[in-house]
Amino acid sequence: MAENAYSKAGVDVDAGYQVVERIKKHVARTERMGAMGALGSFGGMFDLSSLNLKEPVLVSGTDGVGTKLLLAIEADKHDTIGIDCVAMCVNDILAQGAEPLFFLDYIATGKTDPVKMEQIVKGVADGCEQAGAALIGGETAEMPDMYGADDYDLAGFTVGAVEKKKLITEGAVKAGDTLIGIPSSGIHSNGYSLVRKIFFKDNDFKLNEAFTELDVPLVEELLKPTRIYVKPVLEVLKAVDVHGITHVTGGGFVENLPRMLTNDLAVKVELGSWPVLPIFDLMKKYGQLSELEMYEIFNMGIGMVLAVAKEDVEKTLEVLVQNGEAAYVIGEVTTRSDDAVIFGGAKG
């Protein structure tokens, strides 16, 4: 009787049970040492003693995917958006030197579609596998009075750990350090309100628009999942003393690079030292944006930046290449006299 009354209120309990059954196989493949408990427990559990850290510091992060979700909904493609959610969280805690341990997701929707929910969680599990994190819990909330039937929101939460003496904070970066950039896959998960405005409001392009500059239709380019840098960067952290790490997200270079600096330091970024992806040139063209504006908003083809001592540059590049990464020397840290970010050859 209670179930029937709940159904009349617009909440499909049976669909929720179907989701749990469908996602079990995806959750199972994210298991790692330290993860405890089973799917359906009230709380997710992790055994920190499995890490063998002398002074463990826990580092947590939470994030969502923003309005990139609207493109996934419109294109009816939901199997990679979960990777974005994981990436936004784990890349952030990686910037402190932390290894992601576990992840939890939260999906809110107007109507529970078990197939769609499975696709979303599959993406989350894919991201967790890439990051080496266990998917130890989550929540799917059906709220018909809050969301349209096809709408959903996705958020994630991660916790990682690092040995206290290896925790990366802004005080470690020094003048003379070299900046090494690791490529992005594209826009990643920031700036999509502007992206959608440029392509679909200010210009009447279609989702499947073909641009000669792109090797895939527009929507495929825009939905390319955010790269997860955990495994290659953790290998670098084992090999050299990394002074600072920046995850280039919302606010682009201008807002994010200073986050690893003290107030007396600046970074000089040499434009042209890495290939800018074609999607950014298209947005600059059709959005009529200046070059500086682009670097204030987007990652411009670099998703993560490491600051290392000059004597560690060669080893850092070597480790990244050994782990399948392209990497570029993109600038240096200097003493600050004015702006925190200086662009060599920047155009207005």
UniProtKB/Swiss-Prot annotation:
GO terms for biological process: 'de novo' IMP biosynthetic process; adenine biosynthetic process. It holds the Pfam family AIRS. Pathway: Purine metabolism; IMP biosynthesis via de novo pathway; 5-amino-1-(5-phospho-D-ribosyl)imidazole from N(2)-formyl-N(1)-(5-phospho-D-ribosyl)glycinamide: step 2/2. One of its GO terms (molecular function) is phosphoribosylamine-glycine ligase activity. It is found in: Cytoplasm. It comes from the Bacteria. CDD domains: PurM (cd02196). It catalyses: 2-formamido-N(1)-(5-O-phospho-beta-D-ribosyl)acetamidine + ATP = 5-amino-1-(5-phospho-beta-D-ribosyl)imidazole + ADP + phosphate + H(+). SUPFAM superfamilies: PurM C-terminal domain-like, PurM N-terminal domain-like. GO terms for cellular component: cytosol. It is an enzyme of class 6 (ligase). Keywords: ATP-binding, Cytoplasm, Ligase, Nucleotide-binding, Purine biosynthesis. The keyword Ligase applies. Its EC number is 6.3.3.1. The keyword RNA-binding does not apply. Belongs to the AIR synthase family. This is Phosphoribosylformylglycinamidine cyclo-ligase.
